[in-house]
């Protein structure tokens, strides 16, 4: 199921979704064609950790390729963030918490920018009875500057999976992931689990709305686990171009208070 696959890619990579198809195919059907999609998008997040505020803007670019049931995707952001200098702000996604906090008496706020971490994912979709399933391996390559506190400077990797089922014009889904976090110098980190539940609502053959709840375990004891709710709209501008917008609101104290996203996918 394309919707299930593409939703997980979006959740896992934190990048724009691939050009989605709203006409969901039966899970018994083997898709044999090959698609390549160029990805672009922007994400804005703001919040506070331990009373320290931050704002982050990520400009993402990437590519996704699908052949039959196999999917490969890669993305890399350019990050601009304003935050206390002792906070490490990463590009988020399944392979790291959006924010790592190191205990410090410093509180000077600084603005830094640069290339974020490269995210790679390889996945496979398959049916389980009446369900559509997708499983993927994920790697975060530490291309972001550790000196600028735009990343941890360490390699992360993990597994993620999602199941979904179409019921009329509704497609409920649930996803989960486990991530092995590379430990940066000066931080005590732990591996993390994350998950989300929600549903797609098919408005037409080319448009859908998604509502979801997400939980993400913190990689450090200095930051609380994240909980949030979100809503998004994805629609086709043409047979090759899709546009998506989404918004999330934090439910826990250390989760981003607000997160806004804009994405576009151009298929070939």
Q: Predicted segment positions?
A:
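Cleavable N-terminal export/targeting peptides
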Residues: 1-32
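Transmembrane beta-barrel domains of Gram-negative outer membranes and organellar outer membranes
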Residues: 20-183, 192-268
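Active-site cleft segment of glycoside hydrolase catalytic domains centered on the general acid/base Glu
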Residues: 187
